[in-house]
Amino acid sequence: MHAIYKFTHDGKQLVQTIGTPTVKGADGTHFNRPTFMSWLPDGTMFVADGYNGTRVAKFDKNGKFLLDWGQKGNPPNETRPGYMNNVHGIAVDPVTRRVFVNDRANHRIQVFDENGKYLYEWSMGAEPSDIHLLYMGADRYIWAFDRGTSKVLKYDQEGHFLYSFGTWGDFPGGFWGVHGMSVDQDGNFYVAEVDSGRVQKFRPRPGANPAYMVSKPVYSAWH
C-alpha cells in the first residue's frame, strides 16, 4: 500500500518502486492510497492519489517527482475547481497533454493542463452513478467504467456520451466490479474485477467497427 511497483513484463523482477511502502503521505516520496496512473508518450507519468490523498502527482519517466495539485476542500464535497473528493481515475491526452481526472465522489471529470492549471469540467449527474476509472488510447476518446450500471462508457473530450456496452454478471463476458482496464498493442481488452477476483480478456472481433472498440494504447517511453 502507498507505493507503485514496476516489474518486468513477465512479472518476475521488481525494477522500480515509487513511494514509500506502508508509509502514507503527500509529497514526492509518499502517497496516500493511490488508485491509477497514466502516461504521456515521453514517459511522463501522472498518479491519481487517490482514496485519501486527493491530489494528482506528476513524475518524469525515471520516477523523479515534478509537481502535484489538488485538495479536498472544506466541507469534503466542495466543488470549486481543483478541489477533489476521491481521485479515482486519470487519463492523459497524448497530443494536447491535457489531464482528465475522475473526481469520483463529486460525480465529475475535471480537466487540467499537464502542470495542474484548471481548464474545464463536466458533470456526470445522477447517471452514471459511480465512475471508477478512465482510459484514453490512441483514438483520444475517453473510456470509463461505471460500477453502478456495470457498463463501459465512451465519451468525447467535452463529455458528450457516445456509446456503452456491458452488463452485470459473474458469467464470462459479464462485469462485476471492474476496478481496472487496459488494452494491449494487439487490441485485446482486459478488465480486472474486484468483486469477482478475476481478470477477463476480450479479443477484437475481425471486421468490427473501430468506433465500438476500446482503443489501442499510446506507446510510452516508460518501459
Feature map (PLM): residue ranges:
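Eukaryotic scaffold repeat domains enriched in small/polar residues
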Residues: 1-223
